[in-house]
């Protein structure tokens, strides 16, 4: 089953890759690793999930934003492998930044929205190392930003 079909079965659609917001590239491939710049919860039709967890947004809102960020990571992976998903060896690492109030402490539960999607799609190849970090703000007031390292053949 293709990644696109698996996403469809989950009620999700793989978006087009988003251009960078600044003076950087969306990914760099080096020695079989692809380093993917931070991806936010940007919607396919424009707009994004914005705000701070603990200030009107809850864990479920954050997990949905993390899942959307993961979809945008997948769009960059697809660009890097030329749509040949067989080249993806595994998801190696995620670092999730969570826009949250000082008293919000459920950062791992939020970033699970991304981690669980990768496992649902790729099984063991989707399991990865990870950090989940709370921050005072993010670009564009995003709820979550996630960067990734993936291995390709």
Question: Which stretches of residues belong to each language-model region?
Answer:
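Short, polar/acidic, helix-capping and beta-turn segments at strand->helix junctions
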Residues: 1-153
């Amino acid at each position: 089953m293709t990644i696109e079909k698996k996403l469809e079965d989950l009620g999700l659609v793989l978006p087009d890759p988003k251009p960078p917001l600044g003076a950087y590239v969306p990914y760099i491939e080096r020695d079989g690793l692809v380093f993917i710049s931070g991806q936010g919860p940007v919607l396919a039709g424009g707009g994004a999930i914005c705000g701070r967890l603990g200030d009107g947004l809850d864990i479920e809102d954050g997990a949905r934003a993390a899942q959307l960020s993961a979809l945008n990571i997948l769009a960059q992976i697809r660009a890097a492998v030329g749509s040949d998903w067989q080249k993806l060896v595994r998801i190696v690492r995620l670092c999730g930044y969570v826009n949250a109030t000082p008293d919000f402490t459920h950062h791992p539960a939020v970033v699970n929205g991304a981690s669980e999607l990768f496992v649902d799609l790729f099984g063991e190849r989707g399991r990865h190392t990870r950090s989940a970090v709370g921050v005072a703000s993010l670009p564009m007031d995003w709820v979550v930003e996630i960067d990734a390292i993936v291995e390709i053949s």
